[in-house]
Amino acid sequence: MNGQNIRIRLKAFDHRVLDASTKEIVSTAKRTGANVRGPIPLPTRIEKFTVNRSPHVDKKSREQFEMRTHKRLLDIVDPTPQTVDALMKLDLAAGVDVEIKL
């Protein structure tokens, strides 16, 4: 796989789970002899939702909820076939979304 890069983008709501998965991917890639660029922290997306506290009165009384989506970016430079096999067999946490581009 000469001259190819694998770009891995990870997303999760909990940054601790995301960082643990990132460390697992980096250690697996380094163990199989590939060079790793990153992890690069991407901007956190914050979605805020405002709702009324009461069902039908008191418009001024509101409550806000937020959802934070944390993201990381990894580049694996010149991966070996062993790297690709090891990454395919890797079992990550349930709350992590993984996007892979070749």
Swiss-Prot record:
Q: Which GO terms describe its biological process?
A: translation
The protein's matches in SMART domains, at most eight in alphabetical order, are given as:
Ribosomal_S10
**Gene Ontology CC annotations of this record:** ribonucleoprotein complex; ribosome
List UniProt keywords, sorted A-Z: Ribonucleoprotein, Ribosomal protein
GO MF: structural constituent of ribosome; tRNA binding
Q: A Pfam family in this protein?
A: Ribosomal_S10
State the family it belongs to: Belongs to the universal ribosomal protein uS10 family.
- Purpose: Involved in the binding of tRNA to the ribosomes.
Subunit info here reads:
Part of the 30S ribosomal subunit.
Q: What is this protein called?
A: Small ribosomal subunit protein uS10
UniProt source species: Mesorhizobium japonicum (strain LMG 29417 / CECT 9101 / MAFF 303099)
Q: Which gene encodes it?
A: rpsJ
